[in-house]
Amino acid sequence: MSLDFYFSILPLLVSIFWFIAFAKHYRELDAAKRVLTIFFGVCSVLELCHALLYNVFEDHVLPVPLESLWFACTLSVYPIYYLYICRLTADSVSPRKTALILAPGILIALAFLLWPSAIIDTVRLVVNIVQVACVVVLGSRRLRAFDHRLAESYAETEDKDMRPTRNLLIVILLIAINSIVLNILGRESVITSQWLILFALDPIAVQLFLLGYIGYRRSFRVEQFLADNPEETLPDTPAENKELGAKIEQLMVTEAFYLQQNITLTDVARKVGSCRTYISSYINNELGCTFSDYVNRMRIAHAQELILRHDRSNGESKFSVIALEVGFTNEQSFYRNFRKFTGMTPNAWLEKQRHENHLS
């Protein structure tokens, strides 16, 4: 078999691999991963149509029923991925809204099945472009908003935030642009060129693999977020900012509650005897930061004291030990926050302190 054949079935193999990987654990999956399972099921059908187009039909034209199926899948994958983002960010989507999101692809596919024409194919391409733009813009907005909610709820967000998924949206956009350009060039131009087949299908295979890998590895469930942040009833008479601030400072600074691992806004609210909304509002408006930054800034300041203390006593500064002492659960979180608040790594910061102390 030629190299073209392997290039043409690579996206299909990747789609089937991830569909099986998710489907065999379907009952144990959370709502987001169940949507991702459906996504890879649709991708498998879509890439099967591609494989048949490139390798089975000599004139490289799909029969109208298969072409209609290809239309439906092409115009469904991006909306389904957007539904996955909605599930991932604790945004419930009603059945009616889901139907509206998926309707364009189904209607255009039915229209092509009944009245196959180049005009409908052009409509399909235009709708596809609009879908990609909406998924990238609206999806990125939802992911950023959820990251902010995470930073307002947890001290450490490394294993929870949406940066990998946000970065994937850029990949999706670039590959979608690639697909649109190839659509404009036409199937015949792509199919008759080995390099264009490689350019068309290999990036799609890489994208599908990354989508599956990041989705599969994600362990933080939105159900956990909802459990950690239950709906609360606001008291009729909110505490004065001065009084609330004093309670927060007593807990976090005097009692050094920030040294506890895995603390959440709910933990602080319970200790202070107030509600999360008021505490979050106080930290945002009066202290000018998120809950995560508030806690981790104190942790890094404490870590700096420990590093200098170890250095003055001629002891080796074991950053992994210090990270745990000041409340971080792992070195990765410690290093990221240290760089965030100081602009440098712990080693570079220590060398700078030694140099300044030597000069003084």
Predicted stretch roles:
Residues M1-W115, I120-V126:
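N-terminal low-complexity or simple alpha-helical regulatory segments
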Residues Y213-Q332, N337-K340, N347-S360:
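Membrane-proximal linker segments that couple transmembrane helices to downstream signaling/catalytic modules
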Residues D59-S68, T89-V93, I120-Q131, A151-R163, ...:
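Juxtamembrane/interfacial segments around transmembrane helices
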Residues L10-V14, V45, P79, S140, ...:
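Hydrophobic faces of stable alpha-helices that mediate helix-helix packing
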Residues A21-A31, L53-H60, Y84-V93, L138-A151, ...:
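Juxtamembrane transmembrane-helix termini
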Residues Y26-L48, W70-T74, R124-G186, I191-Q207, A323:
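Alpha-helical transmembrane segments of multi-pass integral membrane proteins
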Residues P11-F17, T74-L83, V130-R141, I204-Y213:
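Hydrophobic cores of alpha-helical transmembrane segments in multi-pass inner/ER membrane proteins
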